[in-house]
Structures are given as structure tokens and as C-alpha cells.
Amino acid sequence: MARSLRRSALAALLLACLLVSPVFGVKASSLPEPNGSSDSGQVYLNKAADAILALKSTRFSLKHEGTPAFLDEKNGVMFTAADCAYSAPDRVSCDIKASLKNGTIVQLTRVWVPEGTFQTNPLTRQFAKAPADSNFNGVMLFAKTGIPEILRTEVQKAQVVNREKIQNRETLHVKGEVSGDKLNPLIGSTLKPELMYRVDFWIDEKSANTAQLHVTEPDAKGWLIELFGTDEPIDIPTPTLPPSPKGKPQA
């Protein structure tokens, strides 16, 4: 009986070893464990930066949580959410949901192309040059000095949190802190430059593409950016402006 029990125990041990062996297809993960070191978190932030710079195109959404943020402070236009498309290297189009001073909700389109920044009139839907002092630059998100630079050099206390499923994708959740000064060019100068803000990144384990990015502000406010549909065909033409009134050339 004792010999039989020993044989059963040995067989169970061998089976357990075989099940976790790479030879049988269950590969030991090379990813850092949750709550890993800042060095391991930075490794994945660097990979995500490379992936953004390699993008041919992507669709993304941008949402401000809590009270709306200014899209055009001079004219009192407040931003709430946007559905956008990016075509490398320098074309972005966003359908934006905004509110006016009187509380009216409007839809407008803003386009960033090499020829300039254009925006539709919420009433006529015709394009014109966007106000020069408008906040938020969609192209800046994907520029070398945008999200990629933040991922590489500006995230303090980077730490792997966990593996999580986002948009049906297996992602690695990395958190850290970034100064408002570095984040403001990306999200429209809404943060205090001298403060540090928690930023969470969800990075696709297979492609290293950023699936989601969240900036946490005080008072239950924040910014959420979600990326999807990467490297699909996207065409963002330069908007056609309406004819200028006689004697008043378009700026």
C-alpha cells in the first residue's frame, strides 16, 4: 500500500511538472509580475512609445470626466467628448461634443492637417480656420514630443499593476505620475503645471499598442483616451473652405 501511494504521489508530481513545462505549450510569462519594479514598468512604457511612433493610423476617443473643460476659452466653448481618427504622420479629425456658454450642446468637427487647423461652424457645418488660441492639439498626441516622449521620459514611479482585459484585448496595466506641465500640451492646458497627476496606461501585450490612457484629476475629474482600429485605411482630406465674402479674403 505504501509503495502504491508513493508511486501515485510521484506520478502526480511528474504530471504537474509536465503541465507547466514550455515543451507542452504552457510557456512561462516573460512579463513582470504585478506590483513589479519601476524598471520593469518602464520597459513596457518604452515599447508602447515605439508602437505609437510606428502607427500608420488609429481611431481614438477622448472624454473629459466631471465638469467640462474649455475647448475655446475666449468664446466659452466647453469640451465634453470626441471621436477621432489619426492618419500618420500629421492628420487628425475629431467629431466633438461641446457646450456653449448658455448650456446648449453642439456638435462640431475639428481637423488638424499640415495646412492648418480647421473647425466647422455648429450651425452651418461649414469649415473655417480654427481660433488661434484654441486648446488641445490632436496631432500632438502622436508626435514624437507627445505621448511617446511622456512614455519614455516623463512617467515617475512607473509600476506594473496587473494584467487586465480592455476592449477584449489582454493588456498590461502600468501606473505612474506625470507633471501637469508635460500633460497640458496634449489635453488643452487644463491642469496645474506644478502638480503631479496619476496616469494609468493599458498596453496591449501582443502589439504593445496603448489601448487606454487615463489622467486622474482632483474632484473626480479626469481624461480618458481609448485607442482602437489601428492601422486601418483612414483618409483625412484637407477641408474645403466656403468662398469668402467679396473684399474679405479668408484668413
Explain the meaning of each model-derived region.
Residues 2-91, 164, 234, 238-251:
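N-terminal leader/targeting segments and the immediate start of mature chains
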Residues 45-50, 81-88, 110-114, 199-205, ...:
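Extended lipid/amphipathic-ligand handling interfaces
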Residues 54-61, 88-95, 168-175, 207-213:
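Short, hydrophobic/aromatic-rich segments at coil-to-beta transitions
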Residues 61-69, 95-100, 175-184, 216:
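Generic short beta-strand segments
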Residues 66-75, 102-105, 182-192:
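Flexible, membrane-facing loop/turn or short amphipathic-helix motifs
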Residues 83-145:
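An acidic-aromatic
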Residues 149-160:
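A short, amphipathic edge element
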Residues 170-243:
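Gly/Pro-enriched, hydrophobic low-complexity segments
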